[in-house]
């Protein structure tokens, strides 16, 4: 939900977290009313460089992190907990000892600019306008030149800055200036010394805790998610492997074949041309055969994104 008053005032966004954009200063002010509450933070590129050999393409996802805001003195810190080393013991002190034995990562620190009874306001502009995706590093590693972020040529991009009930989205225009090397950047950039992309930040609400982990089976052909559980019995492996999978439950658990409570749906960009669009739908729907063998009916769908749907809304 967005409300705007005038050019000289603020544009307010109401959603998973409320924030405002000041038209005069160009700053984003975020309101935090749930400290120490975990959510997902994802960065990506909403506009890329255009050369596949660079690997900086439109829509490329960066890191996905579980994070939370916490207060320390006059600061709000964005912290990424260590989820690789855990203890699932019924003993609180054992869990606490393992938690304190391994490092966390503070991703950013913010000064508190306003405090109310139930919330804090912080300026997150500097957090957004930074090279979170590692563009300059990728350019350097690919021997394409030495670039640094030029903040005077970077700004918040409101076209893709939105708020929804379960997620908030921020988009920024970033310009990197430097000296290109080779032809990879020159071939796709009007002025190779000034390379401009758009970087996206997503804050997403986590689902409920009803998801059930499943041990990894190497026959699945998938990659495992690995954690080290210090509460495992002494004769068991410290390393625990779990399969990365969709959350899928039968609507009628007692039936041999049942529709799912919620199907898995992959959406195709409605700008995809034919015959590519039809081929993607037909090919993707073949997966339903595998799900039917596992006892599910119409559990996997490939659909064209509806014209009135916003792809940034996680719902």
Give the label of every model feature segment.
Residues 37, 271-299:
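Zn2+-dependent metallopeptidase catalytic core
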């Amino acid at each position: 939900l967005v409300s705007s008053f005038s050019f000289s005032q603020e544009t307010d966004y109401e959603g998973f977290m409320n924030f405002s954009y000041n038209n005069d200063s160009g700053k984003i002010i975020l309101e935090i009313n749930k400290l120490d509450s975990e959510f997902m933070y994802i960065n990506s590129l909403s506009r890329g460089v255009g050369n596949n050999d660079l690997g900086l393409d439109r829509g490329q996802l960066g890191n996905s992190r579980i994070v939370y805001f916490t207060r320390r003195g006059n600061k709000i810190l964005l912290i990424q907990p260590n989820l690789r080393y855990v203890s699932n013991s019924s003993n609180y002190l054992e869990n606490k000892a393992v938690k304190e034995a391994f490092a966390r990562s503070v991703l950013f620190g913010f000064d508190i600019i306003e405090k109310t009874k139930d919330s804090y306001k912080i300026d997150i502009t500097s957090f957004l306008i930074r090279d979170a995706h590692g563009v300059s590093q990728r350019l350097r590693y690919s021997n394409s030149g030495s670039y640094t972020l030029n903040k005077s040529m970077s700004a918040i991009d409101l076209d893709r800055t939105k708020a929804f009930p379960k997620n908030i989205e921020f988009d920024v225009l970033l310009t990197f200036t430097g000296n290109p090397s080779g032809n990879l950047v020159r071939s796709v950039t009007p002025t190779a010394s000034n390379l401009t992309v758009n970087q996206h930040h997503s804050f997403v609400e986590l689902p409920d805790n009803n998801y059930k982990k499943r041990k990894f089976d190497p026959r699945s052909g998938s990659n495992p998610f690995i954690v080290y559980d210090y509460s495992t019995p002494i004769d068991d492996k410290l390393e625990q492997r779990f399969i990365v999978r969709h959350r899928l439950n039968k609507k009628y658990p007692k039936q041999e074949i049942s529709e799912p409570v919620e199907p898995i749906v992959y959406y195709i960009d409605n700008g995809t041309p034919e015959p590519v669009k039809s081929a993607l739908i037909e090919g993707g729907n073949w997966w339903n055969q595998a799900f039917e063998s596992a006892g599910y009916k119409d559990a996997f769908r490939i659909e064209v994104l509806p014209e009135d749907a916003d792809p940034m809304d996680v719902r």
